[in-house]
Amino acid sequence: MSILSTGAEAAAPTPEARVQAFIADFYKLHAASASIRKDMDFDKWHAAITRLESAHFVAGARSGLDGVMAGNPDHAPGAENIIRNVSQGQDVLIETSLADGSLHHYFEYELRKVGGDWRIASLRTYLDPIDKPFMTEAERARFEHPRLVPLRALPKREAALDGTAMFVNGRLAQVGGESSAIEVRRVGTLKVNTGILVAGDLGYDSKLLAPLGQRIAPGQYPVEVSIAFKRVAALRMKISDRPVVRWHPADMSERNHVVGVDAADVFISDISALLPVTIRHKEKEFEKFANAGDLTSAIMLNLAGPDDAVVATSGYGDGAYPVYWGVDADGKPAVLLVDMLVLTELSDDE
């Protein structure tokens, strides 16, 4: 029977047998659907992948392969080899490696026994060995000993910033002739162990993260988001209850106060949350956020421990987003704010 047809798949007596059967069937599907992929017929490709998943995955689980049509097959018998098998309670994790020219791809299959059959519960793809530290040795140095950066005045075009007004629940915001009521949502409480905060995009590697140039006292701080125009408009961490009297750019140790975003997220944590984390654990935590699939998503993550990081959807997606310190009358940080550039009436002087 063609892999493009619907049919009953034989039960797999072992986790390894299921993985090997899936690899072989995907490879056959990839070859048999060359014309579908050439024509970029997404509907037919999606239908074929759905049938493949039905044959090998637990009910409702997805492979993520329906979005991958071009290039060499992601899985190929003989080229993709099992490198580790780990029991995890009732489930089994199988890790594989596939060489594609000069590149290596690593896969993690989570398998679950359903009756007498082993099925794939999840499939994750990595570009580096799965247990490799998220932060390289070279990267660790700039995070462990970051440079302190004095506070400076806001740039002229940002002088109109009103970060406090961004968090007035029910306030009617006006942008471009449209209006939206602001909704303030509590995300959680961020645990800060060292007082060295990191901001950026968690979706890729640590190069998109940077330590901030100011320090705060270790402690636990409430985190909120402002929702407007059906998206996250701002993210803030309240360091104290004292009123903010001035705003300053939250410059980073080796760059300005703007975080570059390529995965549509803004992330904040203490440095202690990142140093011990492996690529596998970082990806699993970030997956919780990615699976929400909501323009208003903001959740706490558990990297090195409970609630030691926060991640939120970044305004209108990829781009560059400014970070600010709100200081009290004594010049001490009272708020850390990320402006998602949605409420431009409150952030842009032009």
Segments (PLM) and residue ranges:
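N-terminal domain-onset segments
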Residues: 4, 12-16, 20, 137-350
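A short, structured loop/turn motif at beta-sheet edges
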Residues: 84-91, 111-117, 327-332
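Short, surface-exposed coil-to-beta transition loops
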Residues: 102-108, 318-323
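Surface-exposed, charged secondary-structure patches
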Residues: 47-105
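Short aromatic-glycine motifs in intrinsically disordered, low-complexity regions
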Residues: 67-70, 109-114, 312-315
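Core segments of small alpha/beta cavity-forming domains
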Residues: 7, 11-68
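Low-complexity, intrinsically disordered terminal/linker segments enriched in charged
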Residues: 15-19, 23, 27, 86-91, ...
